[in-house]
Amino acid sequence: MKRLKFGLIPALLLLLAACSNDSPAMVKVSLAPVPYSIEVPAEIAEHLSIENMVTSTPSEFTNQAREAGAIAQVYINYKAADGTMHGFAGVYYFKKADYEKAQNPNEPPVYGSKVVEENSMVVLIQGPQDSMFDPNSQDGKNSAALYTLVYNPKSFKSS
């Protein structure tokens, strides 16, 4: 029986190690000033940058969001293999009550889809409607994977 245990344990450890190597290394990308990070594969994270909408690119829309109660607003930007930068998604952080007040039930959500709700606060994603890259290219595959991640609440971790 002891031989079986000692022979089985190393085999199970090798199997576990082999399985864990199949999944990509995940990296936390801070969304500050939104108090969350998003976990993405390392090979996608190297293409991402976070831009504070209010300080970097203020606009009439960012002012409207702030007046509606947005506490923080950031862009997730994606740098393609050819070096061009593309706005991928907007991330908005609201008190739940302010978010609900800003919504018109007869229209699409102004600030995107609610992805995280925690402690009377919400994280909203206003993401791409369509891929900006050839779906067969590496950028297209990264974009599709990132799209799935930004709409998955489990991808977000409170900072």
Model-derived regions: residue spans:
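Bacterial N-terminal signal peptides that target proteins for export
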Residues: 1-8
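C-terminal motif of bacterial Sec signal peptides marking the signal peptidase cleavage site
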Residues: 15-18
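Bacterial signal peptide processing site
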Residues: 20-22
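Short, hydrophobic/aromatic-rich segments at coil-to-beta transitions
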Residues: 24-28, 70-73
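Short aromatic-glycine motifs in intrinsically disordered, low-complexity regions
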Residues: 26-40
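Secretory pathway targeting signatures of secreted, lumenal, and periplasmic proteins
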Residues: 39-92
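Short, surface-exposed beta-strand/loop micro-motifs that present aromatic residues
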Residues: 108-117
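Surface-exposed amphipathic alpha-helical segments
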Residues: 125-159
